[in-house]
Amino acid sequence: MAHRSVIPFGPQHPVLPEPLHLDLVIEDDRVIEAIPQIGFVHRGLEKLTEKRDMHQFGYIAERICGICAVGHSCGYASACERMLDIEVPGRVQYIRTILHELSRIHSHLLWLGLLADAFGFEALFYRSWTLREQILKIFESTCGGRVILSINEIGGLKHDIEDSELAGIVQTLDAMRPDYEALVHTFLDDDSCGERLHGVGVISKKDALELSMVGPFGRASVVDYDVRMFGDGAYADLAAFEPIVATDGDCYARCQVRCAEVMQAMDIIKELVGKIPHDGIGGRTKLTPADGARGEVVIEQPRGEAYYYVRGNGTKNLDRFRVRTPTSQNLAGLTHALQGVLIANVPMIILTIDPCISCTER
């Protein structure tokens, strides 16, 4: 029997900016088992619901994660609106969806840059983050913040985004698209990238379903599930699109899905801007949920399905706030993908899965 040893990976590693720790059990340079450990940045945000009223907690919910801030803000507000039986105007739904899709573009461009940097592909890293900067400028010009937008509130929006600004968003995305398509062509068709990604970290559709994998991680293994199409968080009635899937289930397939989702998000935004209604943006309302009233919603974050649950207690504070983030769902798939791979491929596999520990540890 070959000698086995345990090598620690993280929580601080030059390839992975996330504080994820893995104990890698290796045998002859191959990973036999990966044991995850998290909890290094736990902040107890859900507990703060007992000390902040519902309006105040909206600012905290948005800070669960910087990359997914818009999605967390939309998820929290939507769950509270379900609990309070508040129906927001159509314009609010459209603007939230537009900002959420911009956040998806931002997240995937950030991820692509980090992956390129791990390859040593510095030119691609710079090009990817140069395009990402355009999205951050859109956020800043329309909402005032580059990361934390603070535009959502329970019952609507704090301020409107004018039609001229929305048209400017479309113009920016149209100008970005040729550069982005050239960037993706460079990355996906590069032989050195293909050699590092093809056939690495393969997960079959059967395993993906059994492990309840979500988001691009699952769709790269032919799991045709996207919350934007199904369930409470769907907005397929607002725009025409289909879930993007790949068939190989390896690192390359996960890259294909995310790269295609950026262009899909651009198309969704363009369609929404072209038919956005003008029925107002709602506004702040008095928040007095009945004791025991509940609200829940699922939305498709850049990394997959996120679930939000709120429960009232008859006061202005929530009795309970709960989030289940996509990385929580995907940790089992991550450890499965690492089994049997060369230890040199571990960073690539983790990066293509794109875990977000800030979301997971709240």
Positions of the model-derived regions?
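Active-site bordering "gate/hinge" segments
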Residues: M1-R362
